[in-house]
Amino acid sequence: MFLYEKLDTIKEVDGLLLIPHFLKDNLNNRVELRDYQIDAFQNFITYYNSEGLHKNKQIHTLLHMATGSGKTLIMAGLILYLYKSGYCNFLFFVNMTNIVEKTKENFMNRLSSKYLFAETIEIDGDIVDIREVDNFQNTNENDINICFSTTQKLHFDLSVPQENSLTIEDFEDKKIVLISDESHHVNTLTKKGKDDIAEEQSWEYSVNRVFTANRGSRKLFCLSLPPLVI
């Protein structure tokens, strides 16, 4: 049985866990959640808090949503939720630089009409700042620290360590939430039949390497549905 089928059963029998107030309160007040976005949040929260659903494995979640349906808003809300759950370091990576820049606008630019968080983020009575970082070596655990990268740059940084860039040690020493948009691009280089050397040079190998470096890390992938052709 697929995970979504298990969650559908839970929804019918016991009901899904509700979205906590702090999550809604710390999103931009112009945002009105759509029904399917509420479902997405409740599905994740129920899954995250149900040991039987992930069988004590590292949490690795795929959100399969249509282009323009508000995937980035879901990411923003889950960043808040996971921060409250003890995660302060987030790696956002995607295949194209322009998507990285658009997401920075959504997450970092308070003056933008597309900014997704509240003007002031307050969790458990504390003001929480969102900071863009180049790596996770000296991050403040009281902040939400986000490192933005392309999949290609992430792979290069891990393969050719440089000063102030991400290294595998960042991921061994800290719990990191990995967030990938348009994640179907991540595994385009790894195919059946490739030899081990080619696989170790792939982007997918690098992503899996950082994910498994610390058992406490979490992975959230977002995948767009293809356009409907009529």
Named regions from a protein language model:
Residues 1-230:
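RecA-like P-loop NTPase motor core of helicase/translocase proteins
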